[in-house]
Structure formats: C-alpha cells, structure tokens
Amino acid sequence: MVVATTIALYASPASTVCSTAHQINAHISCDLDLNSRSSSASSSTSSPTIGGLSLLFSGASVKSSSSSSSSHPSVGEELASIRHDRSEDRTLSGSFCYSPSKFIGSSYLKRDHQSPVSVLHGPISSGNSPPMRISRDRNLDGGSALRVGSSRLFNGFVRKAIGSCVDYDTDSVLVDEQLPFTMDDGFEGERRQPYARDLLRRAQLKHKIFEDESVIKAFYEAEKAHRGQMRATGDPYLQHCVETAMLLADIGANSTVVVAGILHDTLDDSFMSYDYILRTFGSGVADLVEGVSQLSKLARENNTACKTVEADRLHTMFLAMADARAVLIKLADRLHNMMTLYALPPVKRQRFAKETLEIFAPLANRLGISSWKVKLENLCFKHLHPDQHHEMSDMLEDSFDEAMITSAIEKLEQALKKEGISYHVVSGRHKSLYSIYCKMLKKKLTMDEIHDIHGLRLIVDNEKDCYKALGVVHKLWSEVPGKLKDYISHPKFNGYQSLHTVVMGDGTIPLEVQIRTKEMHLQAEFGFAAHWRYKEGDCKHSSFVLQMVEWARWVVTWHFETMSKDGSSICSSEPLCSFPSHAEDCPFSYKPSGNQEGPVYVIVIENEKMSVQEFPENSTVSDLLRRAGPGSSRWSMYSIPAKEELRPRLNQTPVSDLKCKLKMGDVVELTPAIPDKSLTEYREEIQRMYDRGLAFSRPHRAATGTMVGWGS
C-alpha cells in the first residue's frame, strides 16, 4: 500500500493548458433545422431511391486494356462516372467522366437526373442506394474475395498522409452477429434493427475500415444515441452519421477520424457526454467530437448579415480549429448536409448555402480537397442561383458530344502506345458549373466562348512522361495559342500540379487536356490528406505535433486574410499563399514583427498537445504562464501541492526573460520540471507517509497476531 501510494505521487494527472477559455460548450440542435426530430420509429418506410452518393462517389464502369477482372456496375456508376482507363487505378479519373466502353443513348441521358451532369442537379438521399460494384468472382454466400472500387488508390501515397486504413481488398464482411465486443446497457439484444444492419453492410462493402472493431462499436453507439431521431429528409439520423464517415473514408481517413465522424453529432443531439465518449473510445476520439461540436455551434450562430458578429465568431472558429482533423469531419458533415439541403424551406436553404460558399468551400479549397470543394460550390450554386443553375445545366447537357469524347480518348491512347508512353488512366471530364459561372462573370463571356468546358485527363507514371505526353497531344491536335499552363513547374497556391493545354478537337470543338502523375492527382483530389505525411528524421516533437503547429500557423494567417477582406466577390476564394507555407510578399505572414496591433495568436504546446490561444496586445511569456496556472496552485489527487515549474521555450529557445513579448504565430512549449526544493519536500512527505504507515501497521499486527513482511 505504501509503495503504491509512493508511486502514485508521480502519476498525477498532467496540467492542461490546451483546454483554454476559448473552448465552447455546445449542446443544442444541429446546423439549422436540417435534422428535425421525430418520435416515430427509427426505420424508414420510404421506397428505395437511387442516387446521392452512389452517383457522386461510385467507381466507374471501365474498359481496361489489361486483363483485369470485369465487374457489375450499378446504375449510378453508369451515369455519373463513365470513363475509360487501362489499369486498376479506376478512381483516378475524378468525379465527372465519360467512357467509350458503354454507350448510353441520348434519350436515356435526357431523362430526369440522368444527364452527364446529373451530379449537379441536386442531392438525393442515398440511404437505400445500391452498393458499389462487386467483382464476378465474389461468392455472396461467403466464398471468395470481395473487391470494391479501386484496389490501389490509397496504396503508399495517401495511406502515409494521415494513416489511412482504407483497404479495398477485403476478404469478408463482418456481420453484426459476430461482433468481437459487448455493447453496454443491454444493447446487445436491441441492435438488430434491419435498417441499421443494412446500413452497416453497405458501408462495409465500400470501405474495409467499417469492419474495424472500434468503427463497428461507434456505429452501434450512434444508433443507440440517435434512435428515434429523423432528419428533415425522412431518413433515420444514423444515416447522416454513416454518410459523413463514408466521405471521410473516401479520402483515406484512419479509424480514429472515421469513428469521430460517426459520433460527430452525439454531444449536441443525444444523451452522450464527453466523459462517456472518453471512457468508451479514448481521448483522441472524444477531443475530435468536442472540436466538431464547437465548430457546429459557431456555424449555427453565425450571422453573415452582421460583419462585426461574423468577424468575432470567425476568429473564435479559427481558435477552435487547433486539430485539423476536426475540420475535416466538419467539412464532411457540411458536404452531406448540402447534399440533402432540398428538405429545408427555401429561405433556410439560401442562408445555409451562402454560409457554406463563404466559409466552408474556401476552406476546402485552401486545403486542396478539390473533390469536396467542387461539390460544395456546385450545390451552393444550385440553391443560391437556381435559375442560372438550371439553364447552364441544360446548356452543358446539350453541348455534350459523347462520340467526340470517345473518339478523342481512343485516338490519344493509340498515340501514347505508339510512342511507348505508359499511363494509368485516360478519361473524359468537364468543368464544374460553378467554375463556368464564375468565369463567365469574371471575363464577361458567354458559355459558348469558354474553351475549357470539356476535356480529357491523362494520368501517367512520372513527371518526365507528362511533358512527353504533352508533345503527343500537340501532334494530334492543333494547339490554341496562349492556353498552355505549366502548373508542374509553377504549382497553384494549394499545391496543385498539372499540365493544362487547350487544343482544337475533332469538329473544331475546343478540348482542354490535363496531364499529371498519379501523385499529382491524389494531391489535387485529397490535398490536405496528401500533404500531411509524417515527417522523417530527428525531431524534438512527434510528427503529429509538428503538423499541428503548421496547421495553427496557417490558421493564424487565414484569420488575418479573412478579417482584411471588405466584402469580396463570392467567386474570389484564392488565397495569396498555400498551406502551410507563405509567399515572400504575403502581408499576412506569421513572421514576428514588432508593430503588431490588436490581439496576438500564439501556439501553445504542452505534453504533446497543442492549442491556439488569443492574448491581448503586448502580452508576455509571464502572462501566458499565469493563464496556464502557477505551479503552487496545482494540486494532485493526494492533496499534496504539485509544485512543478513550467519551463517555457519560445520558438525552440529557452526563455530567460519572462517579460519577453509574445508575437503573432509564436510557438511556446511548456515543459514541466520539478525544482530541487520541491524534490526535497516530496522526499520528506513520502518519508512521513511511510512512517505513519509503519506506526499504523505495528499495533494492528500486535492485535491480530499476523506477521506482515516485505519478503517471504
């Protein structure tokens, strides 16, 4: 007992500077009224609806020049992601693609929501959408392997980015009757609701990460938490949780992020508390869910009509974004809400879309997640300008020449083979409606005057082949002067790299051709995930902390940039510099300066946890330590003063003068250390406890006649 008590003295909970006054408690309803509550049964009685994510995220039906296994595409796949490739890297060609492998008649394309741009016509609930294609060698009774989507999309590159657990080569689908854990509160017998079981199985068919024990447990915890809750669409609330998590899995998020995605609304909309999630899933998941809750509260209360209030809430939002993974979850949550926005009244749709276009779409853009950025912008465009969206959708559909795209793909493939240039994918694509709309406004053009609406995308092995392929393209078709853009040598602000050229295709129709490597494509589609690879080499901190510091510095910059804008155009979302670096002439750089006015934002690291904290102008390191709490005021669980000192390091340099002023973007590390005087006091206190223990045990042994010793 004495030994255990002595050891416990050095295991008292660490101080937590990270949980500052800027944390926000949020326990009210979710974003706007999208998630209406109902006391009706959890299971939905609505008829199956084909669409939604099956259109947006399904892989394509492809004709491979290699001998790859054939598959059975779903209806959504045939409509939304039709393309042509020659490898198993089938998801490389993007969201909007055409293919010569399957011809669809024009009458079929002109049916409701069945055009090549049907993904832009508005979201449809995907609760009963068919799963992704299953290869023919799949024995549905449990025999052979299941292959869903691309088997190699996240191998290596994105997997290293944020610890991806995505694996498309799953041997089996774990059914809920075989759970490797036991649910609490007698939930084991209640969990077999058909809609929940089917929802989990569909998720498992698409992503193996949904077979992870923690993910399955989170699924059933979310089902229990949201049971009886219905969304405005009429779907069970659990469906939104799973769709959000599936969006995260699509970009390679690991199990911690996916679990937090499933649970992201439990703090605001259920009986669950932070402590409950902490006990059940650990601090990593609990902190992420709390971070998403903070962002959700700010989004709910944001009033874009009042610039002063908006500025205050935006800068608080930035402070809440210390963990970038929470932002990923919030972006996925917002994307799925936008996909089901049709269920809200028109006024609320407009307000929700305006906020998304002003805050969340630019955020996805700056992080380089182009697939999410495009979807958010197009959905906002649909609800903010429905007439223009409808008119441009019809024009884009009418201008689509499937035969021309098919011919161009085949022609380019033959030329590449003749030159001995290997490639992964050749696919058709078109410019997003919102991008076309912005270009028309900016350059005062008609839709017919824009040359890069339709085009091809070519994915090759390496950078050298990019330039070789460019030469092949210019031999096949005549180049439009002044339209060549080399983003490989001069990347865009968010790290985007590619070669762009415009040529006159067959029939004198302008055709934009994009050429990039597989790595460049993954960077373009999942920029944030692709960028955050774990760093190698000798580091004083864990790679995760270093990444968080980069994120915090970038947040500080974006704060100043956003606050400096005086009502910019809705189409101008391009920042001056890319995450996490800064351009040399960037006026919002975090480089320390002596003439800083207004509040100062400082990155604080303690016990490998990081927070972004706001301090008044002219604050010092001493002020920061005072906020952290003096050592003499900290008490351990044994009522012994925890007199450790916080030894600060400012930008990796020990601080000798506590009156040193803090500057924008400073990194302050707080390292606890026990001074010599306190060590002496600890030893004396331990000795006194030991003596009291001996004094108590001697009369007790004498009374009972029991021999107690340290050894045998």
UniProtKB/Swiss-Prot annotation:
Region (Disordered): 65-84
Alphabetized UniProt keyword annotations: ATP-binding, Chloroplast, GTP-binding, Kinase, Nucleotide-binding, Plastid, Stress response, Transferase, Transit peptide
Pfam families according to UniProt: HD_4 (PF13328), RelA_SpoT (PF04607)
Interval spanned by the transit peptide: 1-64
Subcellular location as annotated: Plastid, Chloroplast
Catalyzed reactions per annotation: GTP + ATP = guanosine 3'-diphosphate 5'-triphosphate + AMP
Span of domain HD: 237-338
Job of this protein: Probable ppGpp (guanosine 3'-diphosphate 5'-diphosphate) synthetase that may be involved in a rapid plant ppGpp-mediated response to pathogens and other stresses.
Name the UniProt record assigns to this protein: Probable GTP diphosphokinase RSH3, chloroplastic
The species this protein was found in: Arabidopsis thaliana
